[in-house]
Amino acid sequence: MVRFKHRYLLCELVSEDARCRLSLDDRVLGGLVRDTIARVHGAFGAAACSVGFAVRYLNAYTGVVLLRCRKDFYQLVWSALPFITYLENKGHRYPCFFNTLHVGGTIRTCQKFLIQYNRRQLLILLQNCTDEGEREAIKKSVSRSCLLDREPVEELSDSAGEEVAEAME
């Protein structure tokens, strides 16, 4: 049995209009990339990339997109991304472009890179703060979001511990 090797392109959709990112849909985005590949590389590029191509992850709030394609043809996808200059969805046309952040062999390596990238962006954001009030607001927001992520896990472990204690009695 042969394993198909893939490449994952971690991209960021950059647009000045916030409505562009919020109106994202993985099917629309996948179709846009496929159409661009066909326009740039012709029938060969469209056929070569259509076999293993998929949008694996899409975050509409941050504009982060993870594209999967076959290892042999990832350069065709990568070279077609700069030719995407707009996103058309529901009759609206939004100017945008793709910024390729990372090319990896697994989803896990892309996740690790994205965590490091977000940490660097947060550090830059904190360094560019003009006063202490902005810096404290950002720190409070980040710590609040971290606490919200951890609370459900603690609640689950507490309730599981109580169930184990009841079962032992």
From Swiss-Prot:
SUPFAM superfamilies in UniProt: Rnp2-like (SSF160350)
Superkingdom of the organism of origin: Eukaryota
Gene3D superfamilies: Ribonuclease P, Pop5 subunit (3.30.70.3250)
Gene Ontology CC terms: nucleolar ribonuclease P complex; ribonuclease MRP complex
Modification Phosphoserine occurs at: S157, S159
Keyword flag Phosphoprotein: yes
Pfam families: RNase_P_Rpp14 (PF01900)
The keyword DNA-binding is annotated on this UniProt entry: no
Keywords in alphabetical order: Nucleus, Phosphoprotein, rRNA processing, tRNA processing
GO molecular function: ribonuclease MRP activity; ribonuclease P activity; ribonuclease P RNA binding
Primary localization: nucleus
Subcellular location: Nucleus, Nucleolus
Single GO biological process annotation from the record: rRNA processing
Assembly and interaction partners: Component of nuclear RNase P and RNase MRP ribonucleoproteins. RNase P consists of a catalytic RNA moiety and 10 different protein chains; POP1, POP4, POP5, POP7, RPP14, RPP21, RPP25, RPP30, RPP38 and RPP40. Within the RNase P complex, POP1, POP7 and RPP25 form the 'finger' subcomplex, POP5, RPP14, RPP40 and homodimeric RPP30 form the 'palm' subcomplex, and RPP21, POP4 and RPP38 form the 'wrist' subcomplex. All subunits of the RNase P complex interact with the catalytic RNA. Several subunits of RNase P are also part of the RNase MRP complex.
Described purpose of this protein according to its UniProt entry: Component of ribonuclease P, a protein complex that generates mature tRNA molecules by cleaving their 5'-ends. Also a component of the MRP ribonuclease complex, which cleaves pre-rRNA sequences.
Family assignment from sequence similarity: Belongs to the eukaryotic/archaeal RNase P protein component 2 family.
PANTHER family: POP5 HOMOLOG, RIBONUCLEASE P_MRP SUBUNIT
Name this protein carries in UniProt: Ribonuclease P/MRP protein subunit POP5
Annotated source species: Mus musculus
Gene name of this polypeptide: Pop5
